[in-house]
């Protein structure tokens, strides 16, 4: 039996890694999101039951759970040098002349590649397994970011050959992900990233790998730093990297001379704005590897390669009007409507104005002559006003008092920059809200990923979270990616979600400032969700850890007629809106527990919820105040610390006895044994 399980886990690991490669590297998926989710879920469950069979290249090992205190230093096996820059055709030809003098021949090729604007890293593999990854740092010493790099799905954890190799790549954030991230940060009043490079660097250097995983970074591998295999040319090396399973820079060109190389650079510049990732130039490299050794390098840069940098571009134009757009979380964003102007190869007729404070600070008015540039070469933005061309006919802009999409009230809290639509059913907000509603920490509807939600939303089958519970078999079965089996599975998952605890539903509603902890607090202090329609700010401020922003947000949300309508439809569909607090005992009130290792019958979250429902407190760290540590298979350092401190140890059998105890006295007896 155990050998069968081991083989099945290995089969799932290989299968999921294959589909990751097809999706993240080749951009050519072969299965639906739902089928992928089911494979992944099976693997997670098997690994939970049989932790001794967790393979190092398992896709579940991409996201670690531990938050680091800092990054260790790593000395690079081969220095990661930077490139010298050239800025025009003449300087490029000077580079070619110097290189020919250095190597004593003109009988060689160049390879021209994109200069990805990201963060350079080294990836080290031993016998085909990814063992270490580090940032460039100063070129000689970088930071160990192995766990964070594992979250990048285009980085293979196991190569297609059992080879030892060190490669260099550029981690970047795709343009669409950068835009999404900054929109989210703007809506949450967090500082914006200036460009995709900063976003990639900030994401990769997160101490918590789970945050890195959410940022959807990507990588292009562009060089072999060290390898057991002998290769003759750089082009050959790129093809070998592809063969091993790496994602390499697309559209590289082998050029016979510097003239062809410059033509290739011009073509790259022409299509720069059409690329899904950010580049700030092109790289020209000597193709013949043996001649690179002849050319050599300086302390900082190789003499056999150069970066051709593209210049930034700003243009003057007229601001014709200011249009207000509504984001997915309800924030109103002013957008400049411009007299069309060509910037960086594309016609720009709209540009961001960020927020009302930005407009006031820059004194931007409708009718002004303004300077526009592409922020990070992606997002057009108005950067300044040409005051010398102001005529006096310009108009001052003010934010609307009603949402331009749904007509609901627009509010602005005193301590915030953002203006917000309060409408629950505003179409501009609904899509993002639905994604949040179905997510794992909310209503946890299996198989309802982003592609499924997008399809249903675009078809008009769901406009609010409540619509999910009114979907019928005939609505789904003929849609793309659906069949009889997947339709039935999704409908079962939707049905199962109706019984989630009330705190899950409150969190799923996406109330501003109300996270999982606050949602649980609310659920513990009310009988049903109906109580929130009459609750006051004063009452909310009496709750543990509730501040003014949270109280105001809850009251505002539940005073909206659209909220009442949404809740009524959820109730009519059979979704649980009643608190479990009265049905639950408090036999473990005052006790504190810590969980470590894998339980065979319960996930970590399930065990935590059971204990909390009985009045217990569950913490992440062991101290002298801890009542007991519940230990599963393969426990961590918490088990050792509990033994050192003399804290009570409970196994899974003890845990089950404890949570089934009928009285506090019975629970105390179990804890005293």
From Swiss-Prot:
InterPro entries: BRCT_dom, BRCT_dom_sf, DisA/LigA_HHH, DNA_ligase, DNA_ligase_AS, DNA_ligase_CS, DNAligase_adenylation, DNAligase_N. It catalyses: NAD(+) + (deoxyribonucleotide)n-3'-hydroxyl + 5'-phospho-(deoxyribonucleotide)m = (deoxyribonucleotide)n+m + AMP + beta-nicotinamide D-nucleotide. One of its GO terms (molecular function) is DNA ligase (NAD+) activity. Its EC number is 6.5.1.2. It is an enzyme of class 6 (ligase). Transmembrane segments: none annotated. The keyword Oxidoreductase does not apply. NCBIfam families: dnlj, PRK07956.1. This is DNA ligase. It comes from Caldicellulosiruptor bescii (strain ATCC BAA-1888 / DSM 6725 / KCTC 15123 / Z-1320).
């Amino acid at each position: 039996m155990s050998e069968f399980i081991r083989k099945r886990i290995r089969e799932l690991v290989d299968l999921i890694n294959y589909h990751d490669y097809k999706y993240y590297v080749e951009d050519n998926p072969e299965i639906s999101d739902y089928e992928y989710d089911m494979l992944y879920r099976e693997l997670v469950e098997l690994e939970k039951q049989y932790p001794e069979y967790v393979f190092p290249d398992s896709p579940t090992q991409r996201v670690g759970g531990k938050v680091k205190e800092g990054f260790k230093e790593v000395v690079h096996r081969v220095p990661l040098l930077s490139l010298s820059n050239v800025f025009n055709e003449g300087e490029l030809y000077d580079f070619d002349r110097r290189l020919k003098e250095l190597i004593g021949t003109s009988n060689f090729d160049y390879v021209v590649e994109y200069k990805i604007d990201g963060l350079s890293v080294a990836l080290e593999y031993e016998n085909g397994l990814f063992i270490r990854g580090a940032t460039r740092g100063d070129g000689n010493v970088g930071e160990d970011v192995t766990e964070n790099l594992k979250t990048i799905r285009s980085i293979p954890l196991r190569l297609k050959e059992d080879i030892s190799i060190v490669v260099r790549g550029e981690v970047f954030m795709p343009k669409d992900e950068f835009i999404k991230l900054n929109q989210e940060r703007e809506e949450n009043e967090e500082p914006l990233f200036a460009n995709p490079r900063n976003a990639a660097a900030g994401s990769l250097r997160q101490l918590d790998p789970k945050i890195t995983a959410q940022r959807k970074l990507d990588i292009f591998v562009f060089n072999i730093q060290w390898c057991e295999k002998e290769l003759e040319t750089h082009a050959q090396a790129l093809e070998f990297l592809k063969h091993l399973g790496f994602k390499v820079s697309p559209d590289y060109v082998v050029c016979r001379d510097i003239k062809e190389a410059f033509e290739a650079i011009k073509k790259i510049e022409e299509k720069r704005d059409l690329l899904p990732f950010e580049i700030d130039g092109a790289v020209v490299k000597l193709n013949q590897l043996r001649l690179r050794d002849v050319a050599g390098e300086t302390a900082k840069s190789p003499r056999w390669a150069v970066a051709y940098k593209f210049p930034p571009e700003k243009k003057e134009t007229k601001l014709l009007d200011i249009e207000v757009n509504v984001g997915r979380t309800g924030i109103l964003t002013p957008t400049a409507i411009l007299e069309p102007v060509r910037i960086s190869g594309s016609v720009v007729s709209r540009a961001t104005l960020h927020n009302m404070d930005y407009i006031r600070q820059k004194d931007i008015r409708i009718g002004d002559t303004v300077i526009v540039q592409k922020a990070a070469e992606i997002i057009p933005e108005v950067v300044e006003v040409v005051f010398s061309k102001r005529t006096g006919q310009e108009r001052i802009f003010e934010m609307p008092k009603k949402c331009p999409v749904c007509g609901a009230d627009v509010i602005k809290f005193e301590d915030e920059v953002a203006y917000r639509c309060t409408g629950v059913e505003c179409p501009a907000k609904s899509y993002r809200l639905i994604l949040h509603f179905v997510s794992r920490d909310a209503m946890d509807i299996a198989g309802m990923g982003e592609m499924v939600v997008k399809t249903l939303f675009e078809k008009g089958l769901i406009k609010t979270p409540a619509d999910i519970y009114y979907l019928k078999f005939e609505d789904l079965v003929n849609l793309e990616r659906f069949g009889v089996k997947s339709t039935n599975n999704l409908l079962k998952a939707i049905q199962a979600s109706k019984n989630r605890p009330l705190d899950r539903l409150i969190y799923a509603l996406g109330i501003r400032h109300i996270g999982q902890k606050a949602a649980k607090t609310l659920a513990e202090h009310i009988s049903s969700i109906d109580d929130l329609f009459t609750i006051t700010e004063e009452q909310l401020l009496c709750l543990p850890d509730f501040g003014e922003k949270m109280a105001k947000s809850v009251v505002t949300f539940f005073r909206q007629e659209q909220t009442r309508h949404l809740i009524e439809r959820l109730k009519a569909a059979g979704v649980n809106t009643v608190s479990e607090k009265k049905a639950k005992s408090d036999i473990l009130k005052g006790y504190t527990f810590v969980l470590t290792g894998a339980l065979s019958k319960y996930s970590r979250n399930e065990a935590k919820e059971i204990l909390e429902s009985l009045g217990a407190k569950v913490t992440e760290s062991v101290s002298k105040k801890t009542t007991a540590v519940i230990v599963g298979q393969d426990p961590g350092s918490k088990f050792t610390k509990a033994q050192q401190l003399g804290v009570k140890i409970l196994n899974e059998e003890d845990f089950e006895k404890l949570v089934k105890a009928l009285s506090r006295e019975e629970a105390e007896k179990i804890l005293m044994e």
